[in-house]
Amino acid sequence: MDLSKLYQSLNSVLKDKVFYGSNVYDNEDNASMPYIVYQEVTKRPASFSDDTPNYYKVNVQITMVTKKKNRNLEKNLEQVLLNSGFAFSLLSEFKNEDKSLNRVYEITMEEFNNVS
């Protein structure tokens, strides 16, 4: 699993507008739209040897927030993910109270423990 590679890929779509876990620059200012937030949401053992996990499957959620529907930006993000080796699933798309749009993707990565 390489979150730094994922960050670099996402940052190529929206330069300096990619955040881990939240969209907060600091305690006072939030990022202006559009921006991307990504975070690990699950980490489950996928294979065992002698009751010890060999590797984990990690699901990472990627949320792109835009002021309004932006199909070109969506296509760009999806193409960058695919070109970077990240197969994605689109989980949902919904409007926020301020009429902004969240488009939520998920990717699955593997984290190996006992590499021989």
What are these regions (language model features)?
Residues 33-35, 59-61, 102-104:
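Broad gene-expression machinery/nucleic-acid interaction feature
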Residues 71-104:
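Short, compact, well-ordered microdomains
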Residues 1-48, 69:
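Small/polar-rich, solvent-exposed N-terminal microdomains that initiate assembly or binding
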